[in-house]
Amino acid sequence: MNHDPFSWGRPADSTYGAYNTQIANAGASPMVNTQQPIVTGTSVISMKYDNGVIIAADNLGSYGSLLRFNGVERLIPVGDNTVVGISGDISDMQHIERLLKDLVTENAYDNPLADAEEALEPSYIFEYLATVMYQRRSKMNPLWNAIIVAGVQSNGDQFLRYVNLLGVTYSSPTLATGFGAHMANPLLRKVVDRESDIPKTTVQVAEEAIVNAMRVLYYRDARSSRNFSLAIIDKNTGLTFKKNLQVENMKWDFAKDIKGYGTQKI
């Protein structure tokens, strides 16, 4: 009698060939989750102003230090009054984008109030994403992203919140991810430092501050791109999405004063 359990109840190998036992065995190595991001997007920056919120991100996907993919859109509109900006791993960003599309589809399916009383608010979308990020972190398989959710609530309040790969969340009148948290945020805080500064700031002033911060990031961040997208969510005019913008009016004269630049001697 053949005592091999893989042989019970099946013809002999001479009839149908040897049985592949690998499908019933564990892998030779333990399962390994993503250890570090591969193709990444850099900073997302945002700020509140008197009637809404403004958010911007460039369109570059970097393969390590290689500026590999152009035209990567990292601002994702969700509904009519929310934009989600994502930095970090591009493949994880695409997964989050699919989750958001499924969320919109599920909310709209057989729901005549999907564009009215039961429309997706920015706060709903943020709570969903914060839960997803914390759940993946708790499984020791995080989505390697930092996310900013910007929008205007149905009552007219500005909404701007941040969540990262650990599920850490916070809010501020100005928010930035990545290198922008070090380089852009101080510039934006010169315009809007506290909640009390928001009613004094017009959309023109806010947009000028964002564009200037994108220029500084292009100067200083080796993973940034000249091309960027900008979205304005206004409680009066709704969502305005500007694509294919470029950093303009650059002045590189300051480079000669940077130690280590070019052929100068230190």
From Swiss-Prot:
Q: Which SUPFAM superfamilies match?
A: N-terminal nucleophile aminohydrolases (Ntn hydrolases)
The reply on keyword Ribosomal protein is no
Q: Keyword Isomerase, does the record have it?
A: no
* GO cellular component terms, semicolon-separated: cytosol; nucleus; proteasome complex; proteasome core complex, beta-subunit complex; proteasome storage granule
State one Pfam family annotation. Answer: Proteasome
Tell me the InterPro entries matching this sequence: Ntn_hydrolases_N, Proteasome_beta4, Proteasome_bsu_CS, Proteasome_sua/b, Proteasome_suB-type
Q: Which residues form the propeptide?
A: 1-33
Localization, UniProt: Cytoplasm; Nucleus
User: What family is this?
Assistant: Belongs to the peptidase T1B family.
Other remarks?
Answer: Present with 16900 molecules/cell in log phase SD medium.
Annotated PANTHER family:
METALLOPROTEASE TLDD (PTHR32194), PROTEASOME SUBUNIT BETA (PTHR32194:SF6)
Q: What role does this protein play?
A: Non-catalytic component of the proteasome which degrades poly-ubiquitinated proteins in the cytoplasm and in the nucleus. It is essential for the regulated turnover of proteins and for the removal of misfolded proteins. The proteasome is a multicatalytic proteinase complex that is characterized by its ability to cleave peptides with Arg, Phe, Tyr, Leu, and Glu adjacent to the leaving group at neutral or slightly basic pH. It has an ATP-dependent proteolytic activity. PRE3 and PRE4 are necessary for the peptidyl-glutamyl-peptide-hydrolyzing activity.
Protein name (record): Proteasome subunit beta type-7
Organism of this sequence: Saccharomyces cerevisiae (strain ATCC 204508 / S288c) (Baker's yeast)
Lineage summary: Eukaryota, Fungi, Dikarya, Ascomycota, Saccharomycotina
